[in-house]
Amino acid sequence: SLIACDRNGYLEESMKIATDENGKIKHISKQIAEDEYYAVSIDVYKLNADAAGILSREIYDTIEVKKSENLWTEVALDAIFSKTVFAPYEICGRWFEIDNHDDLRRAEQIFKGDVI
């Protein structure tokens, strides 16, 4: 399983990932310090069948059993890193995170004229 990430700078407001000595992801959180982070997550995930099942059970347990309905998906991801392997997938090239219409307009201006 993979988490797409960007190594081009620490962003305080973004989810960061930390890796172990083997390069596998061990933690994802906004609170990871700059001297401990490996990269910034861009919130794109590729899960193998094993990880998808484990994550599904973790989310079910969080919502249905623990009754915690206001947590990010990353909280569940962080809880399963000890149960399955995730590696960082470093993106390259230009990209821009779009969370709302204002971000979309800004991205359109930044990438205006780019050929795909």
Task: List each language-model region with its residue ranges.
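Conserved alpha/beta core of the MobA/IspD/sugar-nucleotide pyrophosphorylase nucleotidyltransferase superfamily
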Residues: Y38-I116
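Conserved core of the sugar-phosphate nucleotidyltransferase
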Residues: S1-I63
